[in-house]
Amino acid sequence: MANQHANHSINDFKQFVKKHPKLIKEVRKEQRSWQDVYENWVLFGESDPIWDPYREPEEASEAVPETPQKNDFVSKMVTAVKKMDVNQMNEQINKMSQSISSLQSLLNTFSGSGQKHSQPGSGQHPFSFRKD
């Protein structure tokens, strides 16, 4: 039973790829992997607007966007989250934290006369991040 379902799914995906020849070109240019295309196909389905750029020209003009703008926003957010690199985001947050800390110490240096330690721990970072 599961084997028949898998074969049916694979055949459906093959038909989908035949309808979207630009996907084949992208995979051959190594801009995308078949695994990535298949996962997106399973998640979003055939009628999602993310496939519009890959349709044949006459098919793209026939395709009417039936999905509301909310689904388009959600799909864009999902793809953006998939593309995020966690280590790079952590590094950027750490740099921003250091910048804020430097700015706070600079402001404390030039702020009011006689207020030397108005904020305890001003040399520390304002946000406490730690590596997992």
Curated annotation (Swiss-Prot):
Region (Disordered), start-end ranges: 107-132
InterPro entries, per the entry: YlbD_coat (IPR025953)
Top-rank lineage group of the source organism: Bacteria
Biased composition (Polar residues): 108-122
Pfam families with a match to the protein in the record: YlbD_coat
Protein name in UniProt: Uncharacterized protein YlbD
Lineage: Bacteria, Bacillati, Bacillota, Bacilli, Bacillales
